[in-house]
Every structure is written in structure tokens, then in C-alpha cells.
Amino acid sequence: MKKIIKITIVSVFLILFLPVAAKALTIQIPKESSQIKIWFYLFIVTFFPAVELRGAIPLAVLLYKEPVLFSFILITIANILITPLIFLFWNLILFLAKKIKPFGIFFNKYIVGLQKRAKPLVDKYGFWGLLIFVAIPLPGTGAYSGALIAEIFGMNKWKAFFAVSLGVIGASIIVTLAVMGIIPLKIK
């Protein structure tokens, strides 16, 4: 009976969440839409783990033609808000990882990979290592990963929040400068 309940919960989650997430990432908001609707959309897009600020800033500036400074501020703040949410819901995340097998398998693999990538930096440099890890705007190095690393390594939450926040600001600066063409990107 418990297995049926678990399968039902996972199925309902996948049926409800995945189409919404896919739709949100591919939606084309008409140019004549209200400014608040576009800002809200950009704020929400920033909360998707695979996208975060690395995708939201180019989306804001290049597609929606939002002012660079405003986009930088809005998206940076949204991305910083992820860290306290991870800290707040850490026990729930662990509970779900134990109770929902597919989520648990994915989560455990992700955590093991994160530990391998972050351990040298965090062990050697602590606060600064976490900051540098988050500041590099590559997939898997954003606010989500930074907050998870802080939890995994048992870092002080205030210090970790500060490190992740500074890392997010650093990553936002790098991405914004790249979008503006100041930092040339060579994609092979």
C-alpha cells in the first residue's frame, strides 16, 4: 500500500510540475504584455535550478530588451533568495529523498557529484571556496548548489548565506558583462 501511495505522489508531481516547468521555460510572453508580468516571469525563471541567473539575465536583456541594470538587480535578488529556502526546507528535502525513491536516487547522485566537485575548494578555503564555487557561472555551480554544499559540509548558515550571496553577485556580474559583450564568449 505504501508503494502505491509513493508511486501516486511521484506520478501526480510529475504530471503537474513537469509540464508547468517546461511551459515556463519555453513560454513566449508577447512584447505588449505588461511590464510587471515580464518581471514576474523573469523572477520565476530564476528559480529553476538548471536556469538560475545564467539563463535569466540573457533572457531579460536579449529577448525582452529589459534594462541591463534593472535585470541584473531583479535576477540577482531572486537568485539570492534561493539560499534561505534551501536552508528552510533542508529537512523536507531529506525526507522526500528518503521517501520517494526516484527523487532519492537522483538527489543522492547529485549530492555525491557536488561533494566531489566542491570538497577541494571548501576544505581548503572554507567561506572563500564556497563563494568562488558559486561565482563561476557554469551549470551546477549556482545558488542551489552553494546552499546544498553549505548543508552537506555543515557550514554556519549565516556565513554560508553571505558566501553564496556574494558568489551570486559575482556570477551575475560575469553573466551581465558577457551579455553586454564586454566579456567575449568563445563557444566551440
Q: PLM ranges: what are they?
A:
Residues M1-A24:
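N-terminal secretory/membrane targeting signals
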Residues F47-A60, P137-L148:
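Transmembrane helix boundary and interhelical junction motifs in multipass membrane proteins
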Residues A60, I93, I149-A150, I182:
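Hydrophobic alpha-helical interface/terminus motif in multipass membrane transporters
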